[in-house]
A protein has these predicted regions:
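Intracellular juxtamembrane helix-capping segments at the cytosolic ends
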Residues: 127-139, 328-341
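Structural signature of the two symmetry-related core transmembrane helices
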Residues: 89-103, 183, 290-304, 384
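Cytoplasmic helix-loop-helix junction between adjacent transmembrane helices
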Residues: 117-155
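Helix-to-loop junctions at the C-terminal end of transmembrane segments
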Residues: 75-86, 274-287, 371
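Juxtamembrane intracellular "pre-TM" segments in multi-pass secondary transporters
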Residues: 10-20, 197-230
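Conserved MFS/SLC helix-loop-helix module at the cytosolic interface between two early adjacent transmembrane helices
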Residues: 73-111
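Helix-loop-helix hairpin linking two adjacent transmembrane segments in secondary transporters
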Residues: 150-195
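C-terminal transmembrane helical hairpin of 12-TM major facilitator-type secondary transporters
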Residues: 289-333
Length: 411
């Protein structure tokens, strides 16, 4: 049976969510999270440019998938460390490794070297998801949704503006220059976290191996965790399908536009940044499940717009709706899982985010197949189907919860 465990004093002496200067700490966490997660999206607007530098090397098309897969592996293998180690040195250390991996990507002599570097970039960029549960653990229960929303706004800003930045730099400077720019940004984030993060004790003393083994127990223990993970995996697959193919679609004969234009869609999608704090506040007031439903429906609406209105104006409208829907569902699903067990938030986030980014990796891979077979129409059908899968999971989860409640009341 699921139990909601909350601390009477979740906010520790180093609370970054309180009034005054402590809010600067929360903003610093949001900024650092955005810097970290941006690195897994730099390659998407530049994919055509990268492929042109490595002609005949089919591995170049694997770079976005490798980055997403590296992120998923990092979530599974590194994120549990947040429950058993002091988070501050862990977070700072991951940013340093990220800087080294970006330098390796910048000097990659072949497509396969870049694929390997992309795996490491993806794995080390999971530092963003060390920061999110850290922020949640510092917040009082009544402010947890808003706190998560603020940090996740930084994450979404990083995702979206990374495409704008990399599209511009890739078009006017080169893809290697973009990775070089990422190196000092990662180091700045490391310094920022070293200066602003409070010291925070580990929530568990269990060995690393046992922490990994406990993931299976958490997965079977909490039906809410399973439902949230499946829903977000499907939604994020649709999200990455769009962004993986957008640059190829815009560079095609219909538009003949460059990577910089594909990157500009990141600015358009940045409207979705405002969904994060808003979704957090609505989740605090009306419950996170309500917001998850709304986010899944908006995602489906976005793909209907993409499929029926494939012009630039339709893409602009659709990307705003898509990013708003995905972000709303993400913040609210995290709100749900962080309430399950306060001693295991990093491990709960491990399961949730691993599933989500495996979904993203799947979405990137399948989108390339859909593009090769049906071009934009095929990708639109794929994205819509993934959103429908998320809604079906929500329906099944609600029906099972209702059946369990009825059985309990009748006993």
């Amino acid at each position: 049976m699921e139990t909601l465990q909350t601390s009477k004093a979740s906010a520790l002496p180093g609370d970054v969510t309180g009034k005054g200067t402590h809010k600067l700490g929360l903003l610093a966490m949001a900024a650092a999270s955005g810097i970290a997660v941006a690195n897994i999206y730099y390659n998407q607007p530049m994919l055509g440019i990268i492929e042109a530098e490595f002609p005949g090397q089919s591995a170049a098309t694997l770079i976005p998938t490798a980055t997403q897969l590296g992120y998923a592996l990092g979530l599974f293998l590194l994120l549990p460390l947040g429950d058993i180690l002091h988070r501050k040195p862990l977070i700072v250390g991951q940013f340093v490794v990220l800087a080294v991996a970006l330098a390796l990507a910048a000097i990659a002599p072949s497509a396969w070297t870049l694929v390997i570097a992309s795996l490491v970039v993806g794995a080390s960029a999971t530092v963003a998801q060390q920061i999110v549960p850290f922020a949640a653990s510092l917040a009082t229960p009544e402010k947890r949704g808003a706190t998560i929303g603020t940090v996740m706004a930084g994450v979404l800003a990083g995702i979206l503006f990374s495409r704008t930045l990399s599209g511009f730099v890739g078009e006017h400077g080169g893809w290697r220059e973009m990775f070089w720019i990422g190196v000092p940004l990662a180091l700045v984030a490391a310094v920022l976290m070293f200066v602003t993060l409070p010291h925070h004790r580990a929530t568990s003393s269990m060995p690393y191996g046992k922490a990994l083994r406990s993931l299976a127990h958490l997965w079977t223990r909490f039906p809410t965790l399973r439902m949230a993970t499946f829903v977000q995996a499907a939604l994020f697959a649709s999200f990455t399908a769009f962004w993986t193919i957008l640059a190829l679609y815009l560079q095609g004969p219909r538009f003949n536009l460059g990577a910089d234009v594909a990157g500009l869609f990141g600015i358009v999608g940045a409207v979705g940044v405002f969904a994060a704090p808003l979704a957090g506040r609505v989740a605090d007031k009306h419950g996170p499940s309500f917001v998850v439903w709304g986010g899944a429906i908006l995602t489906l609406v976005a793909w209907v717009v993409f499929g029926l209105w494939g012009a630039i104006a339709g893409l602009i409208v659709g990307v705003i709706v898509l990013d708003f829907g995905i972000q709303s569902a993400l913040v609210s699903n995290q709100h749900l899982i962080y309430a399950l067990d306060q001693q295991a938030r990093s491990r709960l986030n491990t399961i949730f985010m691993t599933g989500m980014f495996l979904g993203g990796s799947f979405g990137s891979a399948v989108a390339t197949v859909a593009w090769s077979q049906g071009e934009w129409t095929g990708v639109s059908i794929l994205g819509g189907m993934l959103a429908i899968i998320a809604l079906l999971v929500l329906v099944l989860g609600r029906n099972r919860s209702s059946a369990a409640s009825s059985k309990h009341e009748g006993s």
